[in-house]
């Protein structure tokens, strides 16, 4: 039998203090105080952009016209930080706020990640929405509900060919639409 080797891992202290509240309610508090942590989620991105600017932050395989995959497209920490800052400024320039957030229709891709980082830098909420609401649904009711609930100032989708029908059906003409590729007729 082959013995698998695993890297040793250290785990934090798991002791907790328990305080009872109302019947059936228990409050747990870790006994170990938190160590220093970044003030903002983007602080680590900024840190690594300075410490290891050329190191790969994210990557994806390029899709070929034949349906296969090509080379890897890498985004370094420095590129990601610069993109996040530029995107943040563009969001601020558009007047996006907590009342007018960004809705992301696309799945997990590099552009989605960079837009999310830009939103974090700018302090603008973003709402990653299940691609199925745009790609599987025929009535777009769930997508309409999301858009009505969060009142976006901007909707992002990676590919107009994939998301165009949903955008046309559900996104109001007063909401800016940003696409990575293609365009939606009338937008």
Please describe what each predicted stretch is.
Residues 33, 57-117, 134-144, 187:
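Conserved AMP-binding/adenylate-forming core of the ANL superfamily
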Residues 30-39, 183-187:
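Flexible, low-complexity linker/hinge segments
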Residues 120, 171:
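Anion (oxyanion) recognition and catalysis
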Residues 128, 132-168:
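Conserved ATP-dependent adenylate/AMP-binding module captured primarily in the ANL superfamily
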Residues 106, 158, 175-187:
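Short beta-strand elements of ligand-binding domains
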Residues 123:
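Structured binding elements
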Residues 15-29, 44-76:
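AMP-dependent adenylate-forming
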């Amino acid at each position: 039998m082959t013995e698998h080797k695993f890297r040793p891992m250290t785990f934090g202290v798991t002791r907790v203090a328990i305080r009872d509240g109302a019947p059936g309610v228990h409050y747990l508090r870790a006994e170990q105080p938190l160590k220093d942590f970044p003030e903002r989620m983007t602080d680590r991105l900024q840190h690594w952009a300075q410490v290891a600017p050329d190191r790969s932050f994210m990557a994806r395989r390029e899709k070929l016209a034949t349906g296969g995959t090509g080379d890897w497209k890498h985004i370094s920490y420095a590129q990601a930080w610069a993109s996040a800052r530029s995107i943040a400024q563009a969001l601020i320039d558009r007047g996006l706020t907590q009342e007018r957030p960004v809705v992301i229709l696309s799945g997990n891709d590099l552009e989605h990640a960079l837009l999310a980082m830009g939103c974090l830098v700018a302090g603008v909420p973003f709402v990653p929405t299940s691609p199925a609401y745009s790609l599987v649904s025929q009535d777009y009711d769930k997508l309409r509900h999301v858009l009505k609930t969060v009142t976006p100032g901007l909707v992002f989708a990676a590919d107009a060919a994939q998301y165009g029908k949903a955008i046309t059906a559900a996104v109001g003409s007063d909401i800016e639409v940003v696409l990575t590729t293609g365009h939606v007729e009338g937008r």
